[in-house]
Amino acid sequence: MKNVYTGESDEHIIGNIPIKSINIAYLILVHRLPDQFKKLFKAIYEPSNFYLIHIDKKASEQIGEEVTDFLKNYPNAHILKSENVIWGGYSMVQAELDGMKYLLEMDTRWDYFINLSGQDYPLKSQKIIREFLSQNNGKNYIKVVDQEKKRPETMNRIENYFEETGDRISDKTHKRDFMKNVTPYIGGQWMILTRSCCEFITNNIEVKKFEEYYLNTLIADESFFQTVLMNTSFNGILINDDKRAIIWIPDGDIKLRPKTFTETDLKFLQTGNHLFARKFDDNVDDKIIDNIKTQYDQPFKTFAKIIDIKSLNKTFNHLN
């Protein structure tokens, strides 16, 4: 039976507890601002963790060389073969899947997979993050809601045929029937997943039909993983929370984009129970990260309540 954590109950404090040794495998997606990436990398670096960096094929040769040269000093950091990642295309999902597979095939043992962009930054130290994952070992963190019931305006993304052509999504599309006996789910791109969850996603034969269908959908990175985990025999615990602090603002007629944080957002970043925030740009505000660091090792409260998967649709009303 799948369970989903959605409510607030069973308070406990992270920051002063004995921890099981938790090793983290990070996948970091980089396409610009190499100095911002370096700042992120140094903030999350631990010798016992593992780091896989994907540099977008569209990134300049200079960025690729700068990032590659920087990582030479870190033996537990690797570079993934570049994918031409197109906004809205399945190529983003493919980069994530390739990253999971690469990390699973490494001759090392890790417990959790966390994906980040090069403009993310941690709100807590690795000590606090590892304590949190130790206390909640076995739980998977990913935003998930019933797409048709809670985000009906996005159904066109999966009920039409889309195709990547060159560096964009083709304007030509046509309607098609969605997958039979499958309930579509949606959430966000960012995840904190157990190793066993990654093994299921990359190795289980049930996932193949989802890969084939979602190859020609729009913004698949926000719904592919959710739909797979909610419509297969995967039996892990899913928590409707990606532990990311993001403020979404309008960007044109059809999409939102994450606000670039400034010092005016500091209270928002310091009062939540998030582990990471997106996004930052020192060219916009080069002081905000220094202020965040002052609370790196302060414990934070986290709340959880197990809800049976059958009650899922009744429990998300307060999130929309």
Question: What role is predicted for each listed range?
Answer:
Residues 1-320:
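ER/Golgi luminal nucleotide-sugar-dependent glycosyltransferases, focusing on the catalytic module
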